Amino acid sequence: MHHVAYTVPDLDQAVDFFVDVLGAELAYRIGPVEFPDSDWMERYLGVHPKATMDLAMLRLGPVSNCELFQYSAPEQRREMPRNSDWGGHHLAFHVADMEEAVAYLRAQPGVRILGEPQPLDPGSTRGDSWVYFLSPWGMQMELIRMPPGMAYESRTTTRLYQPEDH
């Protein structure tokens, strides 16, 4: 995987949050990009031909990149999808210390923790703990702690990537 990409309502706010709160590094920004006299935006990006776009590419940890877009377009939907909606999504961050990470996020302006960290005991994910949180603009994210030796490992040779692998 090279990168994941998300459309955000305010690119400056999102870049600041990813850099200042989540520890990302800004690689570059481009924009505004627009092609008012052609159908380029629709043909290549699947958006309204009159859309304008700004983007930022971020390095997020040792092996991940994250591209953030801000579009302005006619007929643009302006609500974040829920996880249960088609196209719903969330971005998960591995943490070594769940309590410390939750306390850190609780101290960040505009961040909303959804409930409390949930330990998982049954089945393949025994040993995992997780909690969802919302960014200041409502994007769903997750903190996850998956220690080595998870229950699923006894049934397959496939191993999920862990930060310790890098």
Tell where the protein language model's regions lie, with residue ranges.
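Short, structured motif recognition centered on aromatic/hydrophobic residues
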Residues: M1, V8, L55-L58, V63-F69, ...
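Surface-exposed interaction/gating patches
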Residues: A5, E25, R59, P74-E75, ...
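Vicinal oxygen chelate
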Residues: Y6, R29, C66, F93-H166
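Core segments of cupin and vicinal oxygen chelate
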Residues: T7-V63, E100, A107, S124-R126, ...
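A short, acidic/glycine-rich surface segment
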Residues: P36-W40, E75-E79, D121, A151-Y152
